[in-house]
């Protein structure tokens, strides 16, 4: 779900938006190394040939490996300043969709080195990680300077041959106050865990959220809220009130102000009870629009919680790729 009409999303400062990869998990480095190795004995740099296939280890092990590697790369580059993780886990022809970051593994290493020099006390608090197919999504609070609110960040990584091949992200400043009293990161619905639910729920929940997004966002049909959203609905978009009534009021005002809104979902990533939708929204024809990631939690066949991150698409890009 996008923001209300009264709030225009601001493009983050160039130093923030230029992050080549912008989420690093609060997972002990040793645990991440161990997890990556155990899930994929021939992980790049762990004794196997670079680019070794993950086939043969089972789907669950492959997904666990991808999540562990994504966190390992980010922790290495942005918390420890260890650029060797890029050589081990990132393809040289790494494709970058962050509009202020160049393509390639070499560019990532250069940026990581500069990052550590400029923000030696930065923290990366990953709240939740999901993986489906060859994609991994991480939702994080990134704080460059201790004591500040930081930014909300979603990173999406595509894996190829056991290595990170491509990256998209969406970044948004964390505001001082919210319309619903909730922060942008916590889990309120029960059980209060950031981990995704059982894997057998993935296909059903992905289908449910995809249908919901098609109706409420693409077709702007607010009756979809009654069909798909549970009576206890927790909202983390800082500009929309809590609950079902808040969602209807906030989105109704947004659609009324922008009747020509066009929303185009680009990819859907699901694991267990968490489903993320990466979209391009354009409020007014001719505008560049916004990159949006909506993250939904589904419990007992109903959507019970929602987080999102929204970023304006800038005029220029340091690479030849779009944000999508």
What are these regions (language model features)?
Residues 28-324:
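C-terminal and inter-domain tail/linker signature
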Residues 1-33:
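Secretory targeting and sorting signals
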